[in-house]
Curated annotation (Swiss-Prot):
The gene is Rpl10a. Disulfide bonds: none annotated. The modification Phosphotyrosine is found at Y11. This is Large ribosomal subunit protein uL1. The modification N6-acetyllysine is found at K91, K106, K118. Gene3D superfamilies: 3.30.190.20, 3.40.50.790. It is found in: Cytoplasm.
């Protein structure tokens, strides 16, 4: 466990979050979020960090991924039922900002074949990039299902203009152990991104969508 958050504290907070949810069942699957408050950081002067880490358990089961594929990838995905678009379908959007925005909204992330990825700015314009959803590369040596799972399990920390950030680390149907392991990975990775590591952390909380925040640090 990371030195500043004891195993006991983590398990206790996770139990509180999960039990709070059991008391009040919602009609949707609540996400569990890690909320971070930073200190001794100047977003104007200090380098704004950004980084991604893969968690052990998928934090958002409903996270949707669309493959922008060449012929081979489009044929492959038929067997595994993954949403896809080929180059012709992308060209039909005709760089229309509204349509590209709609596409960016429809899916949480995109994968693209090698032959397509370089053409995306030309075919679609900057829409996907602006939405922070520029596709990740999908090569022919990779298993498509495994790659989609990897994208679903990966979270991104990105420092913006404010000193707080939040990322999804799980959901309320997970076991204590799954959630603890994900939070542990996420916290350690985040701290490694910070200039002064733990000295930049003011507070850490976890909370479910509708639940009360539980302090870890």
């Amino acid at each position: 466990m990371s030195s500043k958050v004891s195993r006991d504290t983590l398990y206790e907070a996770v139990r509180e979050v999960l039990h709070g949810n059991q008391r009040k069942r919602r009609k949707f699957l609540e996400t569990v979020e890690l909320q971070i408050s930073l200190k001794n950081y100047d977003p104007q002067k200090d380098k704004r960090f950004s980084g991604t880490v893969r968690l052990k358990s998928t934090p958002r089961p409903k996270f949707s991924v669309c493959v922008l594929g060449d012929q081979q990838h489009c044929d492959e995905r038929k067997a595994v039922d993954i949403p896809h678009m080929d180059i012709e379908a992308l060209k039909k959007l005709n760089k229309n900002k509204k349509l590209v925005k709609k596409l960016a909204k429809k899916y949480d992330a995109f994968l693209a074949s090698e032959s397509l990825i370089k053409q995306i700015p030309r075919i679609l314009g900057p829409g996907l990039n602006k939405a922070g959803k520029f596709p990740s590369l999908l090569t022919h040596n990779e298993n498509m299902v495994a790659k989609v799972d990897e994208v679903k399990s990966t979270i991104k920390f990105q420092m913006k203009k404010v000193l707080c950030l939040a990322v999804a680390v799980g959901h309320v149907k997970m076991t204590d152990d799954e959630l603890v392991y994900n939070i542990h990975l996420a916290v350690n990775f985040l701290v490694s991104l910070l200039k002064k590591n733990w000295q930049n952390v003011r507070a850490l909380y976890i909370k479910s969508t509708m639940g009360k925040p539980q302090r870890l640090y």
